[in-house]
Amino acid sequence: MSSRGEVKLERTHRFLWSKKKWTGIPIMSANMDTVGTPAMHKVLTKYKLITCPARHFLKKGIDKFNKGESNICWFGGIEDIAKLSKTTTGFIGLDVANGYTIRFVDAVKKLRDKCPEATIAAGNVVTADMTQELILAGADIVKVGIGPGSVCTTSCLLYTSPSPRDSDQS
């Protein structure tokens, strides 16, 4: 490769559980009020990026986004499984601050049971072990999210995980 202009970010993915195929740039917007908006979705879709609408749109405002759109991922909490199972977009997901609980793994299983054809994203986790656990529970995509706060337990796990380099030196 002689120039960074030759880099191709677009990829085609076939998902483990849903068996669906998706082509685009595998980057999801944050589901924050200022980012997950209908206006932002119009722009991100032009570049084949995935929009995660802000959570308040799941409660009231799903109709503001294109129905059946393949570049939308509706994230909700464990209490939103019934609502998520009724959406017709490309991706649905469970988004919690700390994905390291049995309750969360069980919620992913429940969502998979309710929506066997859906491409499901789940997170937030940061370790390989929990990523594997969520995939085995039915997640097609595992979300790694590290919060900005000092009490973010995901960042605590990241900072305390031994790096491969450290274990090689022992």
Where are these regions (language model features)?
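Surface-exposed amphipathic alpha-helices with a cationic face
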Residues: 45, 63-66, 85, 105-115, ...
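Conserved small/polar residues in nucleotide/adenosyl-binding loops
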Residues: 159-164
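N-terminal capping/small domains of soluble enzymes
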Residues: 1-71
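Catalytic cores of alpha/beta
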Residues: 83-84, 127-138
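Glycine-rich phosphate-binding active-site loops on the catalytic face of alpha/beta enzymes
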Residues: 55-58, 96, 144-155
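Active-site beta->alpha loop and helix N-cap motifs at the rims of alpha/beta catalytic domains
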Residues: 68-83, 89-93, 98
